[in-house]
Amino acid sequence: MPPMLTDPGLLAVDNVQSLSPYVPGKPIEELQRELGLTDIIKLASNENPFGASPRALEAMRRAIGETWLYPDGSGHALKTRLATKLGVDVGQITLGNGSNDLLVLLAEAFLQPGLEAIYSQYAFAVYPIAVQATGATAVVTAANPPGSAMPLGHDLDAMARAITPRTRIVFIANPNNPTGTWVPAPALKAFVAAVPAHVLVALDEAYFEYTGGLGLQDGVAWLAEFPNLVVLRTFSKAYGLAGVRVGYAVSHASVADMLNRVRQPFNVSVVGLAGAAAALEDTDHVAAAVKVAVSERARVAAHLEKSGTSVLPSAGNFLMLHAGVNARARFDALLRSGIIVRPVANYGLPEHLRVTLGTPEQNDRFLQAWEP
């Protein structure tokens, strides 16, 4: 009789065994259980505090009556609306269960052992998970130093130097999460133009809607010029649909074809498809939410700086604060006040905290609790 296997998890491949799982922001329900609090605000996961468009909510309510049916696996209706809005062909769009899903699809389709993917230090935590799971090699380039014009942001020169014949993907979030920092459009476009043809540039634009007036790119407008560019966006942030998980990639049609070969069937729910299609049409709702976030970004940052807290430049709906050696203690103190923010020690930034911009009232409550 063969010996009994006491830990079947050890059967997993080595590159998965060595992974650290993604840790999301602390849920409200968890804090309720732990501290017995009821008046809680969550400023941890960069969600839209105004929620989804009323049109999206109504569309999703109607779609609930169809949940006994599989969704349209091609997502044709949503892709058609996206194609019209973005000025691209339907065949250039791939839908995902959030843009995280699309990051994983890119890795599955274009990486394998012996190949490399590049991303910057302090880049989004899903990049290493997606890369390492394929057995490919992650090449992490140093970020800008703390005293630079865009501290802790992407160093494009370092990323360019890291490209080799084995490189297949360069991941760049602009603006970056968790830092909020960004690369101006001219510098980023020059970088993309210099990337060799055997390398895909995965341009993560999850916070695209919040970047107006700061000189960032509209990556979709570059696709005709750069066939190796893949632009990723989401309905989770400005559109307020984080809970139903809908994202999309826009790329050359041949890249979309490869992504669809590894995409799981029916990866976006019938409720998500309906909500996203309706949300896309309610431009006033998105514009109003973005306007508040951008205004609050400036107000909250100025207040914090005036009170002695260093804040990184941000083009997203969040701010990265330098909280010092007591960052964990300050996070815990905020929890006791019923405010959830995001520690980023797992990014190698143990002295920082990331704070989502909520409603003005929520932000005032945070600022009051933050005062020493």
What are these regions (language model features)?
Residues 109-172:
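PLP-dependent aminotransferase-like
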Residues 2-69:
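N-terminal "arm"/small-domain region of PLP-dependent enzymes with the aminotransferase-like
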Residues 145, 294, 298, 303-337, ...:
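Conserved PLP-binding catalytic core of the aspartate aminotransferase-like
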Residues 333-337, 341-342, 346-372:
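PLP-dependent enzyme catalytic core of the Aspartate aminotransferase-like
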Residues 39, 89-93, 113-116, 166, ...:
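Short acidic capping loops at alpha-helix termini that bridge into adjacent secondary structure
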Residues 228-312:
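PLP-dependent aminotransferase class I/II
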Residues 62, 66-116, 134:
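Phosphate-binding glycine-rich loop
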